[in-house]
């Protein structure tokens, strides 16, 4: 499962095609089309990245120019130093910090608990297992919105509004993670664990010392996806975090936009603070992302 | 658990059989889920349902009465809720179908065994890791009257004066106005999706295609090579091979992509909250956004009980539609 076997990218098929010129033309068309598509997919980011260097007049001027007339690097410094009422110090750095630590805590707890629960489902026999697993699948089909907003009333009664608790506790372990890890452990040969077990290690020790190290690729894939979902989460922080001081970058940006509607350069610089880190993570862990296609596919079966 | 105890003595401890001991270990392993699910899934669902049966208005209020199913009746006859449902159904229909076709086309293009495909795959996928917030903010800027969308439309000779996110004109009105500039449809439900709404749809299709492409690509790479070779011997190549071999083998992935798309689009929220707040004249209002405003509204406008009922109705619609999709596609496969 998890890591899609990388097919050897053999160059053009071995067989000789008699219609060689038309084949070459087809290839040229294909590559041109794909390059064009790549440009189109990236255009919004490139245009707004270039836009961050424009002045506030230039950024809404007609006709829009792709390149800034003058590279105003100070826009980035200005956005970084933006201060708003009710928040001490620079808001964007504060929001960035909140997003990072929430993402890391969510990632670590979710990966560990998903692996633990997944191991239980994959390896240990207990009554009611099939029923519980079906229940997990059923809750995955349930639209998240049903509990999300009435949850607001629930957490309000608990006094959890404007704290990080509603963003941390309910997502300690999520069905998607359990499913991915269960399928992964099922695909691992059981012999290694049996050897450890016979040597007298407890189930938990076997899990931590033998099974976890073997599942590195699945854990990394899951970790990236969970970090990203926390990093990009909008509705959760929007509902539960009220004071600007506590906000994450996503809701912070929305708050900033509602306060300074015409400050386009700062809005775009702020967007870059959110987009660039996740893009860097993507390019570093590219191969794990690509395997997430089969992971998600598996979750849907 | 003592890690060093020999297994035999451990299994006999506390007078439990091996099976009981094993079961206890199992429950301990899954205990994080059991605790979490009983509070945050089952507990919340019960609480949400209870709220939906009360006339709770402002969320923090302790002043409310049990009113039975009244909220469900109110919700279904609520004009805003009806408008939002019509809006979101247009959204789901158009976005789901176009993004599924687009993702499949992109995956087929990338599935060729040619040099450079990995690089293109990476390049195509990269934009979809950005958050919906960033995408929405960027497009908010691209869609302004003097923005790049109008600029590029102008370059290829199309009308470039539209204030995309402020235009409430419906699709059918736009079509009618091609023939008669005075064309209007008075019934709000028959105008079709507004220009603003279609602009958000286009953005959503554009940003979801790469994610779904990855699902199709994974499925395409699982189709064994010999199947294509067998098809080739039978004389099925190109389009014929696609319709008779590839597409039927992709059926589970198509179902998955449609279901994921349906669940996602029917709950669309982020884009609306950031870009339009339901406007212009409620043409981009969605159930999710309506539920949000009714939950967090000010003391006078909040109707938390009603919002909870709307959330359950929305959930029922989503479950029903995804169930129908599954059945329909499974049945059509049996007929083949």
For each feature predicted by the language model, list its residue ranges.
Chain A
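Short, Lys/Arg-rich, polar N-terminal cytosolic tail immediately upstream
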Residues: 1-22
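A structural signal for multi-pass alpha-helical bundles of membrane permease subunits
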Residues: 6-7, 18, 27-301
């Amino acid at each position: 499962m998890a890591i899609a076997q990388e097919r050897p990218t053999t160059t053009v098929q071995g067989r000789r095609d008699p219609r060689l010129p038309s084949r070459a033309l087809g290839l040229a068309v294909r590559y041109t089309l794909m390059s064009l598509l790549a440009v189109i997919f990236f255009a919004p980011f490139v245009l707004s990245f270039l836009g961050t260097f424009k002045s506030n007049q230039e950024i809404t001027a007609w006709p829009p120019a792709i390149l800034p007339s003058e590279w105003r690097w100070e826009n980035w410094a200005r956005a970084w130093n933006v201060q708003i009422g009710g928040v001490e110090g620079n808001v964007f750095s504060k929001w960035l910090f909140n997003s990072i630590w929430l993402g890391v805590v969510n990632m670590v707890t979710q990966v560990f608990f998903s692996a633990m629960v997944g191991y239980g489902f994959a390896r240990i026999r207990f009554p009611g297992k099939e029923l519980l697993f079906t229940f997990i699948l059923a809750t995955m089909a349930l639209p998240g919105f049903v509990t999300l907003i009435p949850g607001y009333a629930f957490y309000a009664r608990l006094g959890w509004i404007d704290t990080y608790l509603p963003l941390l506790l309910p997502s300690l372990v999520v069905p998607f993670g359990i499913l991915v890890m269960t399928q992964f452990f099922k695909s691992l040969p059981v012999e290694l664990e049996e050897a450890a077990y016979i040597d007298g290690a407890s189930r938990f020790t076997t899990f931590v010392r033998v099974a976890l190290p073997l599942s590195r690729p699945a854990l990394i894939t899951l970790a990236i996806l969970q970090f990203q979902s926390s990093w990009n989460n909008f509705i959760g922080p929007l509902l539960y975090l009220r004071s600007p001081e506590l906000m994450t970058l996503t809701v912070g940006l929305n708050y900033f936009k509602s306060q300074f509607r015409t400050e386009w350069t700062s809005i775009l610089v702020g967007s870059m603070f959110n987009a660039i880190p996740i893009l860097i993570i993507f390019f570093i862990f590219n191969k794990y992302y690509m395997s997430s296609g089969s992971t998600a596919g598996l979750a849907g079966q | 658990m003592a890690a060093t105890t020999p297994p035999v003595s451990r299994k006999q401890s506390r007078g439990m059989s091996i099976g009981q001991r094993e079961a206890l270990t199992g429950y301990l392993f899954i205990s994080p889920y059991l605790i979490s699910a009983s509070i945050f899934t089952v507990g919340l669902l019960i609480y949400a349902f209870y709220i939906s049966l009360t006339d709770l208005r402002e969320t923090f209020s302790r002043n409310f009465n049990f009113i039975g199913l009244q909220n469900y009746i109110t919700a279904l006859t609520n004009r805003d809720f009806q408008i939002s449902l019509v809006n979101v159904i247009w959204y789901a229909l158009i976005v789901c179908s176009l993004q599924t076709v687009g993702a499949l086309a992109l995956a087929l293009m990338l599935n060729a065994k040619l040099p450079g495909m990995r690089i293109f795959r990476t390049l195509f996928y990269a934009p979809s890791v950005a958050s919906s917030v960033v995408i929405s903010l960027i497009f908010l800027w691209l869609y302004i009257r003097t923005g790049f969308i109008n600029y590029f439309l102008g370059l290829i000779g199309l009308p470039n004066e539209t204030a995309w996110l402020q235009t409430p004109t419906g699709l059918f009105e736009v079509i009618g106005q091609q023939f008669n500039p005075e064309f209007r449809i008075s019934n709000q439900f028959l105008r079709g999706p507004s220009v603003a709404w279609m602009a958000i749809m286009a953005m959503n299709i554009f940003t979801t295609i790469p994610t779904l492409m990855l699902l199709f690509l994974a499925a395409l790479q699982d189709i064994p090579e010999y199947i294509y070779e067998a098809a080739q011997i039978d004389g099925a190549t190109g389009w014929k091979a696609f319709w008779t071999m590839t597409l039927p083998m992709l059926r589970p992935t198509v179902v998955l992509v449609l279901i994921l798309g349906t669940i996602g689009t029917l709950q669309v929220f982020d884009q609306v909250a950031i870009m339009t707040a339901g406007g212009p004249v409620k043409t981009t209002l969605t159930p999710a956004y309506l539920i949000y405003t009714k939950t967090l509204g000010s003391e006078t406008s909040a109707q938390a009980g009603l919002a909870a009922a709307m959330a359950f109705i929305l959930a029922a619609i989503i479950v029903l539609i995804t169930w129908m999709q599954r059945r329909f596609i499974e049945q059509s496969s049996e007929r083949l």
